[in-house]
Amino acid sequence: MSLKEKTQSLFANAFGYPATHTIQAPGRVNLIGEHTDYNDGFVLPCAIDYQTVISCAPRDDRKVRVMAADYENQLDEFSLDAPIVAHENYQWANYVRGVVKHLQLRNNSFGGVDMVISGNVPQGAGLSSSASLEVAVGTVLQQLYHLPLDGAQIALNGQEAENQFVGCNCGIMDQLISALGKKDHALLIDCRSLGTKAVSMPKGVAVVIINSNFKRTLVGSEYNTRREQCETGARFFQQPALRDVTIEEFNAVAHELDPIVAKRVRHILTENARTVEAASALEQGDLKRMGELMAESHASMRDDFEITVPQIDTLVEIVKAVIGDKGGVRMTGGGFGGCIVALIPEELVPAVQQAVAEQYEAKTGIKETFYVCKPSQGAGQC
């Protein structure tokens, strides 16, 4: 049973009438451009065919009813006419409440709604299950009530809800790619202007995501430290962000910087350049060059930004040994565990899966999770 069929069936059973719309919003993986977002730089994600699906219908009053199929059909109810506050027990409900609350601040011309939500974006794998939920809820209200909001505004609304209502600091990339993703394309995003450019993906290439299942512990504190080091670097160059520093300017004075800060700055400057070049390589179908750029990105994250762990490096090496120069592989996400992403010719996927199954657990004692994805369409009706 598809998520669409599941949510429509649950909707009819729970609310006693059929849903009028079914909306989906996808998760994402970032192909290249790591830790560049908060430095006003470039990222190159694609939406994946794992998504949050909501069957819904407008109500003729001001009540919102939400059922979470993936949380034992828990039900949340609240009114649009009362202040929207955090739910005491259901964390999932706060993503919904936050999106609705912030949407009211943007455009309050919508009424009540019934929703049943289900998703298959793996949670805790860094594939943006929360952004997918936020964008799905925003799209539901935009579609049901014909709100004059575009995908970028729905994405910004989701980011605000996560930052201010849920209380989790995040950039804009995750929501933006979920809202604006394009089938068979990646999206080059300028994190300063929020400008986007669709980049066609080569035919016959699979997007493979492998979760190391190494439990991330340092990610919060180390993330903040990296951010501070980048801000220190920008101040040294008297610029608002590292986006505004050239590699030539850096090389001329790198010896004057604190050695650790210099390494962090070098990663951001080179990663930005790699990300822009990667968009061109992908568009031209040059998988060999894309693979080189992904390898350079991984080495930079390992040696200059120091955010990989041995388990992740092991996974990358296993995959690289199979694909050679026919594709690319690197860590993706914040670091200290999580996932790797690989662009692999479809015919090599079984060999990669076999090599990882045979070697990764033997070397690390941890069993991986393997996902084969397609670059998918952003949020909309399904």
From Swiss-Prot:
This is Galactokinase. Substrate binds at E34, H35, T36, D37, Y223. Signal peptide: none annotated. Catalyzes the transfer of the gamma-phosphate of ATP to D-galactose to form alpha-D-galactose-1-phosphate (Gal-1-P). To a lesser extent, is also able to phosphorylate 2-deoxy-D-galactose and D-galactosamine. Is not able to use D-galacturonic acid, D-talose, L-altrose, and L-glucose as substrates. Belongs to the GHMP kinase family. GalK subfamily. Its main location: cytoplasm. Mg(2+) binds at S130, E162. Its EC number is 2.7.1.6. GO terms for biological process: galactose catabolic process via UDP-galactose, Leloir pathway; galactose metabolic process. It comes from Escherichia coli (strain K12). It is found in: Cytoplasm.
